[in-house]
Amino acid sequence: MQMVFQDPYSCLDPRKTIGQIIAEPLRIHKTYPSGEINDRVLDLMAKGGVSRKLFNSYPHELDGGRRQRVGIIRALALNPEFIICDEPVSSLDVSIQAQILNLLQELQSTMGLTYLFISHDLSVVRHISNRILVMYLGQMVEICDSRELFRNPVHPYTKALLSAVPIAKYGYKRERILLEGDVPSPINPKPGCKFANRCLMAQDICRRQEPPVYTVSPGHQVCCHMAEH
């Protein structure tokens, strides 16, 4: 398991070259003979779309997109099967975001990778995800396939999130669900559903009892008392 971090500006050691940064996990884990490490690094750079001319460059000499590519390449160095991507495109320009997302999908296809992709941008989530887990205050509220979530959201929080996503279709309007109330403290949560004080569908049971997990359909689960109605 490896990780790609959110901020490409702070996750790379400014005192090391790009080649040294990518080679570091190989040297620590001794997965390659020392004489083959540089060749492995150059191979990884080619897979990640980073020119070999940048081998001796430092992070401050690269733009944000190339830095994030280096972060992805470093994560690939040990041939992981599972990579956690923590908001990997949130600090990048939209055009660069698309390039990084396409790179991640290409690497997933060619290397058989599984991603845990964390994001608050639903358009990005829709583009890259096969299954989506929606969380509120650190707890699951809904999980299902990507298409199913956008077509048939069940939890009130999921519906509110999706209502805020812009639609690029002339003349089409979607009713925006505006949430009221303050976000409760995750440190000292009240009994019942954590979303109850902001939910337009909340009933007395929601404020008293934590909702169980209901199966809406095969592969589609939701934590909501109203899901059974």
Describe the residue ranges of each PLM region.
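Interfacial catalytic loop of ABC nucleotide-binding domains
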Residues: D7, D39, N56-Y58, R174
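Conserved ABC ATPase "signature" region
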Residues: E36-K53, L162-S163
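P-loop NTP-binding/switch modules centered on Walker-like glycine-rich loops
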Residues: I84, P88, L92, I96-R174
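ABC-type ATPase nucleotide-binding domains, specifically the catalytic core motifs of the NBD
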Residues: K16-E36, K47-G49, C144
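Short catalytic/signature loops enriched in Gly
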Residues: S51, I143-H229
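A short, proline-enriched helix->beta-strand linker immediately N-terminal to the Walker B motif
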Residues: A77-E81
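Conserved ABC ATPase signature
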Residues: Y58-L62, R66
